[in-house]
Amino acid sequence: AAGAPSLPAPPAALLRRSLVSLAALAPRTALAAGAMALAPGRPPPWLKYAMIPLVAGLLNWATNQLAVKMMFYPQRWLGLPRWTRVGWQGIVPAKATQMANDIVDDVIYRLINVSDVFQRLRPRDIAKGLPDAWYTDLGRLVADDIGYGWAARAPSTLGGAFNATVRIEGRALVASIVRAVQAEVEAAFDLRSIVVRGIASDTRVLVELFERCGEDDLRFVVNSGLWLGGALGVLQMGLWLVWNPWWALALTGAAVGFVTDQLAINAIFLPVERREIGPFCIHGLFLRRQDEVADDFAEFMQSRVLNAPAIWDELLTGSNSIRFWEIVDEQIRIALPRALGPGALLPVADELRPALLARIREELPKGVPHLYELTDDELDLRPLMRDEMRALPCAEFERVLHPVFEEDELTLILIGTALGGIAGAAQALSGI
């Protein structure tokens, strides 16, 4: 209500707000101090010591920024012209296939049961989703193949009856194919193949996935270099006051770089399980965002990887497509005697079967775009993946992002350690 006193912010929120304010103020303070240090004349003694935590903070911020960029960029190998083995490619693009397989093993298999998902498709809806013209064209092409094209095109009752029969029996055949695929979908559809191909074939997809799901956490790694590095730099300064051989600053600078990166990575993923200590909640920063990340991950996977075009392409041309077309052939063999009925046309079945299979293989890819919207609506994968991911135990959920840091953790720490040592040595030798 108007005029009501506002509730005090919780301690965790106040601490977070203070750290953000300090992080925003530090660069301007560092610039001012740097200007004083570089001004003509000998800088005052206190400034030499004050620069130690400022340099530590800024350097760790810069090295963490560099390390995060090195995770994802460049997306293709970039080497020296004459020394092609000397260069760099982002950790994620370089190991895209391995990481895509890890995502399948650690995440996708926990979210999606292929058999249950395909049961959501209604065979009659799929059969009706293909337009009448598709069935009519298919019937005429098959009739041409076996020498009965005149019947399909007859401008009489015969032609109308032929085409009507084709549409009725064609829909029955398509519905039976869908039911047969549902019965053994594990053999006809390879979930690993569609995910790995969708992610690893274009490294931009994998980079975008990790950047989107880990945006806040990657930003934390960068910004934590500033305030963690600055805080540890104060300890570094205190040590320098009582123990100041030139190499001590280099040694402590390297230690600050090492500890800063370790603390930042651990803060993202540890502790895995939520812990309450007084008014504070101790929980990995990434794990706190499980609901938010689940929504981002599900939306991304459904729109970019597990969408209807990719699903139909996997069925028709993927690694298990041989079994899919065997199912189609089996259903044609069952359907033809029923469609032709007893009589003169029954002996045509043996001739018609391979012709019909060949034409379906040719024409079905042209017809499935009419099924994309229906397929996405009936499978409805986004809420399924979102809800399943939200329900994952924390230890399983952290596998969504942790593999990126596991691959690059040593690189990030080595860069921070080496540059911290170099900066400390430069400070000591320059007298600033």
Question: Predicted segments — roles?
Answer:
Residues 1-38:
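Universal eukaryotic N-terminal targeting presequences
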Residues 8-17, 38-214, 255-400:
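Large intracellular
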Residues 24, 89-93, 225-228:
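Alpha-helical transmembrane segments and their juxtamembrane interface "caps"
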Residues 44, 48, 52-56, 204-250, ...:
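Transmembrane alpha-helical segments and their cytosolic interface motifs
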